[in-house]
C-alpha cells in the first residue's frame, strides 16, 4: 500500500499544528490592527466597516476552505501515519527475519561442527568395531580348533572308557562266578560244619555220660581206696609188711604224679593246637567273608549254623539279627567244662579225677589217631577213642593211684 502511494506525493507534508491562536491566523491572513473611533470621519468609518465585513466574509470563506484543506491534510496525515506504522512493522519483521536467519546460520554452523565431531567419532567407532570383529574371528577360529581337539580327545577318551567298562564288566562277571563258587563252597562247608556240630553234640552227650560214669567209678574207687587204707592201717600194725606196702604206695604215687604231669602237658598241647587250628579256620572264614562282602556294595546276608541271619561288619566281625551269647568252640567247652573245672577242684583238694587219669595217652597212639581221627581233633575229641580203648588197661593202676592220693 505504501508503494502505491509514494508516486502520488508531490511535496513534503507539514505535520505541525496549523494555528495555535486566532491572532496567528489573523496575522497570517491580512494582518492585525486596533480600532479607534473617529467622530470626524463617520462616513469613512462606515465605509471601512462595510469593507471590513466584506473582508471578514471573505476571510471566513477562506477560513472554511483552509479548514477543509486542513481536514484533508489531517486525513492524509493519518493515512501517512498508518503507512509509517505499517512500514515500521515491515522493517521490524525484516529485522526479525534477519535475526532468525543469523540464528539459523549459527545453528547450521553448530550442526556442522557437531556433524564433523560425530563423523570423527564414527570413524573411531568403525575402527574399534573392525578390531573387535577381527578379534572375534580369531576367537572363533581358536574355539573351532579347541572344539575339534576336544572332540578328538573325547572320542579317544570314550573309546578308552568303553574298553575300561568292558574290562570291568568282564572282571565283575568273573568276580560273580568266583563269588558264586565261594558261596556254594561256603554252603557246603556250612553243611559239613552243621553235620560236624551235630556229631560233636552227640559226642558231647556221650562225654557227659562218660563223665557221669567216671564220677560213679571215682566214687567206687574212693570207696575201694578207703577200704584199702583201712587194710593198710591194719597191716601197719603187723610189722615188716607195712614198710614194703608204704614203699609200693610211694612209688605208685610218684609214678602217678609223673603220669598226671605228662598227661596235663599233653592235654594242654592238644588244646593249644586245637584252639590254634580253630582260630586259623575262623580267621580264614572271616577273611573269605570280608573279601566277598568287599566286592559288592550291598552287604551279603549269610546264615549261621543255627539258621540265623548274619551280617558282616566293616571290621570283619559278624553280627546276627538275634542277639546271642558269644559262641565258644567245642575245644573251649570241653576244656572249661570237662577238664579245667574238675582239674582245679581236684588240685585244690589234693585229688585227681578219673577223667584226668583216663586222659593220659602215648605219643605213638596219638600219631595213629591223627591219621584216622583228624577231623575229631578240631572239635576236641581226638583222645576220646583212645580213652575208651585204654580204659580197661588202666584199671589196675587206677586203684593204686587212688589209694596213694587218699593217703
UniProtKB/Swiss-Prot annotation:
Which region is the signal sequence? none
Query: How is this protein named in the record?
Result: WEB family protein At3g51720
Keyword set, alphabetical order? Coiled coil
Q: What is the organism field in this record? A: Arabidopsis thaliana
Pfam families, from UniProt? WEMBL (PF05701)
Would you identify the family this protein belongs to, as annotated?
Belongs to the WEB family.
- Taking the record's annotation, the residue ranges forming a coiled coil are 72-99, 128-217, 247-278
Amino acid at each position: 500500500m505504501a508503494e502505491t502511494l509514494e508516486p502520488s506525493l508531490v511535496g513534503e507534508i507539514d505535520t505541525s499544528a496549523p494555528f495555535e491562536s486566532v491572532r496567528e491566523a489573523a496575522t497570517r491572513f491580512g494582518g492585525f490592527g486596533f480600532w479607534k473611533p473617529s467622530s470626524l470621519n463617520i462616513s469613512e468609518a462606515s465605509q471601512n466597516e462595510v469593507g471590513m465585513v466584506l473582508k471578514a466574509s471573505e476571510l471566513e470563506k477562506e477560513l472554511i476552505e483552509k479548514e477543509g484543506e486542513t481536514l484533508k491534510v489531517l486525513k492524509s496525515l493519518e493515512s501517512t501515519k498508518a503507512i509509517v506504522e505499517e512500514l515500521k512493522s515491515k522493517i521490524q519483521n525484516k529485522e526479525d527475519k534477519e535475526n532468525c536467519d543469523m540464528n539459523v546460520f549459527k545453528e547450521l554452523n553448530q550442526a556442522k561442527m557437531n556433524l564433523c565431531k560425530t563423523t570423527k567419532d564414527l570413524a573411531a567407532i568403525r575402527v574399534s568395531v573392525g578390531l573387535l570383529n577381527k578379534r572375534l574371528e580369531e576367537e572363533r577360529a581358536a574355539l573351532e580348533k579347541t572344539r575339534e581337539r576336544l572332540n578328538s580327545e573325547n572320542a579317544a577318551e570314550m573309546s578308552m572308557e568303553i574298553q575300561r567298562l568292558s574290562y570291568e564288566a568282564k572282571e565283575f562277571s568273573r568276580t560273580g562266578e568266583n563269588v558264586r563258587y565261594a558261596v556254594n563252597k561256603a554252603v557246603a562247608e556250612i553243611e559239613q560244619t552243621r553235620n560236624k556240630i551235630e556229631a560233636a553234640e552227640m559226642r558231647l552227650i556221650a562225654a557227659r555220660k562218660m563223665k557221669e560214669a567216671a564220677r560213679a567209678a571215682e566214687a567206687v574207687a574212693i570207696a575201694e581206696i578207703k577200704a584199702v587204707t583201712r587194710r593198710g592201717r591194719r597191716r601197719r600194725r603187723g610189722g615188716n609188711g607195712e614198710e614194703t606196702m608204704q614203699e609200693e604206695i610211694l612209688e605208685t604215687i610218684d609214678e602217678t604224679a609223673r603220669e598226671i604231669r605228662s598227661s596235663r602237658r599233653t592235654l594242654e598241647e592238644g588244646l593249644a593246637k586245637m584252639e590254634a587250628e580253630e582260630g586259623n579256620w575262623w580267621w580264614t572264614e572271616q577273611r573269605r567273608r570280608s573279601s566277598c562282602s568287599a566286592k559288592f556294595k550291598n552287604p551279603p546276608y549269610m546264615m549261621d549254623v543255627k539258621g540265623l541271619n548274619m551280617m558282616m561288619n566293616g571290621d570283619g566281625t559278624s553280627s546276627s539279627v538275634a542277639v546271642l551269647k558269644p559262641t565258644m568252640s567245642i575245644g573251649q567247652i570241653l576244656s572249661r567244662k570237662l577238664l579245667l573245672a574238675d582239674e582245679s577242684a581236684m588240685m585244690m583238694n589234693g585229688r585227681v579225677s578219673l577223667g584226668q587219669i583216663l586222659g593220659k595217652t602215648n605219643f605213638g597212639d596219638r600219631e595213629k589217631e591223627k591219621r584216622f581221627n583228624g577231623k575229631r581233633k578240631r572239635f576236641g575229641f581226638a583222645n576220646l577213642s583212645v580213652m575208651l580203648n585204654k580204659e580197661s588197661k588202666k584199671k589196675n593202676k587206677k586203684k593204686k593211684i587212688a589209694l596213694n592220693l587218699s593217703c
